[in-house]
């Protein structure tokens, strides 16, 4: 009755990405840049207004509900908060058995053995399968979430900031587990984070997002060691250095102002209000993501 139109938000705008089997693609950017929306769009949890999502030749954006459900066997997600992503009323056994039963990939007689195998894969003892989420630590809960994502043996896993809610010591364990699973199972992993210090340890390539667009894409080492855009340089400068003497003397890049509103984005390059190198052309022209060097794209 009182609904009114206040504007249109392009949370993800013109993004083109591909992920190969066995590859880890790191997706980084400031909070609110569209990383999580992109992840949900890939999974078709959020409807697309344009473009396509293709998984092994199948266009998910034009598929019906039944086909999307079938495709999700090959496309799974690990959410950010292990305290919210697990049903508190379901035991670990129920949580891991549910996708197996829904998709009919395992007979009831084999469910117990399959759940035990999944728990061992992520470093948990099968004797805990009748426990509830509140009986586990944050790191253990995230291992359960990873096991649930692995239950259907997917081709692609999207991990949306899977370690940001965990202690630093636990973060390393989860990162090592994900890297081990990628190698062992030949998974494709899209690893989303806002912290480049985390992403650089696990990614083969890194894509940098700003206000819904991919602005820099390349091999992880190249992006970290030779960032081309000011927004990427600012993210790299925020990576802490273990040596306190170096940390005290190194220059930290702080971008002026706040990210523009996606409801009313600036004209031209969306970064120009905060860019120290902005010129008049930046206010009028949207820079396309284009090849800059071998295996490197820059907007």
For the regions a protein language model found, what residue spans apply to each?
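Charged, flexible cofactor/metal-binding loops and thiol motifs
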Residues: 1-5, 219-299
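ABC transporter nucleotide-binding domains
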Residues: 1-226, 237, 297
């Amino acid at each position: 009755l009182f609904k009114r139109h206040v504007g249109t938000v392009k949370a993800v705008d013109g993004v083109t990405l591909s992920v190969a089997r066995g590859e880890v693609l790191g997706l980084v950017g400031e909070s609110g840049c569209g990383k999580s929306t992109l992840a949900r769009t890939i999974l078709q949890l959020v409807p697309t207004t344009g473009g396509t999502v293709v998984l092994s030749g199948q266009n998910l954006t034009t598929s019906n509900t039944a086909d999307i459900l079938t495709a999700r066997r090959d496309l799974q997600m690990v959410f950010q908060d292990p305290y919210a992503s697990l049903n508190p009323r379901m035991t670990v056994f129920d949580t891991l058995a549910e996708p197996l039963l829904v998709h009919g990939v395992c007979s009831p007689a084999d469910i117990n053995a399959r759940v035990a195998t999944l728990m061992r894969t992520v470093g948990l003892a099968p004797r805990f399968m009748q426990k509830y989420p509140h009986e586990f630590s944050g790191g253990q809960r995230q291992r359960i979430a990873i096991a649930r994502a692995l239950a259907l043996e997917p081709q692609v896993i999207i991990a949306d900031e899977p370690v940001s809610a965990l202690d630093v010591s636990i973060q390393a364990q989860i990162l090592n587990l994900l890297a081990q699973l990628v190698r062992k199972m030949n998974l494709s992993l899209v690893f989303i984070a806002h912290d480049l210090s985390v992403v650089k340890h696990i990614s083969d390539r890194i894509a940098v997002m700003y206000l819904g667009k991919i602005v820099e894409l390349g091999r992880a080492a190249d992006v970290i060691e030779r960032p081309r855009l000011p927004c990427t340089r600012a993210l790299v400068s925020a990576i802490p250095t273990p040596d306190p003497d170096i940390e005290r003397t190194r220059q930290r890049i702080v971008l002026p102002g706040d990210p523009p509103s996606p409801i009313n984005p600036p004209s031209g390059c969306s970064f120009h209000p905060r860019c120290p190198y902005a010129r008049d052309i930046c206010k009028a022209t949207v820079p396309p993501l284009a090849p800059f060097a071998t295996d490197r794209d820059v907007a």
